[in-house]
Structure formats: structure tokens, C-alpha cells
Amino acid sequence: MDQFIKQDETGDLIETGMNVANHFLSTPIQGTNSLSKASILPGVAPVLIGNPEQKNIQHPTASHQGSKTKGRGSGVRSIIVSPSEAGNGGTQIPEPLFAQTGQGGIVTTVYQDPTIQPTGSYRSVELAKIGKERMINRFVEKPRTSTPVTEFKRGGPGAAAQGQTIQEEGIDGNGASAGSKERSGSLSGATLYAHLSLPQQDSTPANVGIAPQSAISANEIMDLLRGMDARLQHLEQKVDKVLAQGSMVTQIKNELSTVKTTLATIEGMMATVKIMDPGNPTGVPVDELRRSFSDHVTIVSGPGDVSFSSSEKPTLYLDELARPVSKPRPAKQTKSQPVKDLAGQKVMITKMITDCVANPQMKQAFEQRLAKASTEDALNDIKRDIIRSAI
């Protein structure tokens, strides 16, 4: 369901309300075509002047009533006053006493003498008029009064155009005005017109003197600018020097990479030497080292014969229960060590002589020593000499 009221429905509601108000306000004169002395309420006849039948004003139907109102009949409903009451002249009041709107949009105006105060039953009619005006003003917009508009022209208005003003014509009735068309006061589209300024009055001209000389502080500003320029050039020189060191930094990086590569090569060679010669730095045989690690001190506590402990023998014997005894145990028979095969070591030393010794004379001397070597110690001596000559 549409919650908004259309303009046609609004016009119908206003018209229905006006008809109801007119019905109750015009009850004393209902059913007559003209106003006569018999139908006019006492106290109202002296007030009504003029002949309203001759001053009926027909207005166009209001645009807000919609197409539905335009389609109705154009009948005229007027209020007529007898000619005897029309002889007295009067002035038109700003708002009519009351009006009956018909189906065709015809509005009849009733005039009132402003010098006569409402008395009797006319007072109730006046109150009804006020209520009706409030109802009309609630739904109908009052016509706007136009203000004098001065047409703006470049160079100022002419003498004849200064006295001309555009004024909207008024309407003789209480119906809604459809408005009137007038020329826009502005020649620049939607921009509002601007009031012309009055001609300037004569004034005393200003004294014009010689322009002042340059300020003293200008020299100081120039000195500051020169100093800033010098500092900027100095900074540029320093930046150029820093950029020139970039190539040297790159060269240092390359040298560091070379040093790291050389160090890695030396470490690899040292690891190879350690693998090829896993000897002891002290020159002590492994059996002696094991024997020194197995020696320990035995402490005897409690009663017993300790005479054997004072002997000069460095060996201490124990029985099955780990008690020191003077009787020595039978010595264990040592197994003879098998003779090591030196052929493999000789092949390795021959390969070392070929790869590590570049001098032909030294190479020939190492080969002769290798041929005469028959023990492991001799072979180890030859390996040490080959490594020293290579370094």
C-alpha cells in the first residue's frame, strides 16, 4: 500500500473540507439564488455594499488539484445582493468574507465596509471566516509578492531604465495564484543579480612619492644565499669522494674472497696430512701409553702381613680376594707381534713423491731412500721429508 498521498487526493480532501465548511456557514441563505432582505441576517445587510454579481472573478483552476478536478463541470455558484443594497460604495477588504468554490474553479468575492465593526450574528460569520482562512493557509501557499528588480547591463543602466521596475499583478480574490512569468534579472544563468553600486563621490587624490630604495637587509640575504651555495658545493665534493671509494671497496671484497679460498685450500691439505700420518706427536709407543694409564695405587687396611710392601719391587700382587700377597703370579706369555706388510706404505709414498716433489733431483733421492727402507720407522721418516719439501 502506498503511504504517500498524491496531489490529486490532496486536492480532493481540501475541496471536500471546504464544501463542508461552506455548507455549515451558508445555512441561513441555503436554497436561494440571490441575497434579499428576507434572507440576510439582521445586522449584516448594512455591512454588505456593492453588487457582487457584477464583480465575479473567474480564476483558472489551481494546478495542485490534478487532472481529476479539471475534468469536472464548470458551474458557477455566486452570492447575489439586491440592487437596493448595492448603491452604497465601499472598499475592498484584503481578504473576502467567505467564498464558495464550485466544480469549475469560479470564486465570488464579497466586500465589506472597513468602517463598520461586526455586530450581532455577523460576528459569528467573521469567526467562521477566520477559521476558514486558517484552513486554507494550511494547505494552499500564499502568492508571493514581487520585489522591484533592476535589470543589470554592462556599463550601468540608462536614464530611462533606472525608473523601470517589474511588479507582479495582484489577484482580486482569495484563490491560489498560478503565478506570472517574468524575465530573469540576471544575464549569467542561475547566478543572482547584483545591485549596482552608486557612483563614487569626488575625493582628494592620494599623494604619490618616489619609491623607496632597496632594503638594507637585502645584502644580508644575498650573503646567506652565497654561504649556503658554498656549503652545498663542499658537500657535493665530499659525496664525490665517497662515491670514488666504491671501486676500492669492491676490490677489497674480491681480495677477501681470494684469502678465504686460499685458507680453505690449506685446511684441506692439513686434513689430508693428518689422515696420511696418524702418528703420536710425543713419539711414545701406544703400549707404553696404555701401561701408564693402567697403573694405579692399592691401599691395604686392617690386620695382616705387610712385610712384602717394603720390598723394592714395584709390582704389587693380589690374590683371588684382592688381598696383597707376596707370592708372585705366573707371568703371562707375550705374543710376538706379526710383521707388518710394508708394500702398501711403499706404494703410497711413491705416489706422494710423484705428486708433491717437483725437483727431479729430490725426487730421485726420495726414490733411492724408499728402495733401501725396510722398517716402518724409515718409511715414516721418508713421508715427513716429502711433506716438508712440498711446503
Swiss-Prot record:
Region Multimerization: what ranges? Answer: 216-279
Source organism, top-level taxon: Viruses
Task performed by this protein: Essential cofactor of the RNA polymerase L that plays a central role in the transcription and replication by forming the polymerase complex with RNA polymerase L and recruiting L to the genomic N-RNA template for RNA synthesis. Also plays a central role in the encapsidation of nascent RNA chains by forming the encapsidation complex with the nucleocapsid protein N (N-P complex). Acts as a chaperone for newly synthesized free N protein, so-called N0, allowing encapsidation of nascent RNA chains during replication.
Residue positions where Phosphoserine is found in the record: 188, 257, 292, 294, 301, 374
Positions of the region Interaction with the nucleoprotein?
A: 343-391
Recorded domain comment: The N-terminus consists of a long intrinsically disordered tail. The central part contains the coiled-coil multimerization domain (MD or OD). Forms a four-stranded coiled coil structure. The C-terminus constitutes the alpha-helical X domain (XD) that binds to the nucleocapsid (N-RNA complex) and the L polymerase.
- Gene3D superfamilies from the xrefs? 1.20.5.300, DNA helicase RuvA subunit, C-terminal domain (1.10.8.10)
Where in or outside the cell is it found? Virion
Subunit structure comment from the entry: Homotetramer. Interacts (via multimerization domain) with polymerase L; this interaction forms the polymerase L-P complex. Interacts (via N-terminus) with N0 (via Ncore); this interaction allows P to chaperon N0 to avoid N polymerization before encapsidation. Interacts (via C-terminus) with N-RNA template; this interaction positions the polymerase on the template for both transcription and replication. Interacts with host RPS6KB1 kinase; this interaction may play a role in the viral replication and transcription.
Q: Which residues carry this modification: Phosphothreonine?
A: 10, 16, 91, 150, 165, 250, 258, 282, 298, 375
Which keywords does UniProt give here? Coiled coil, Phosphoprotein, Viral RNA replication, Virion
What is this protein called in UniProt? Phosphoprotein
Q: Where is this region: N-terminus domain?
A: 1-194
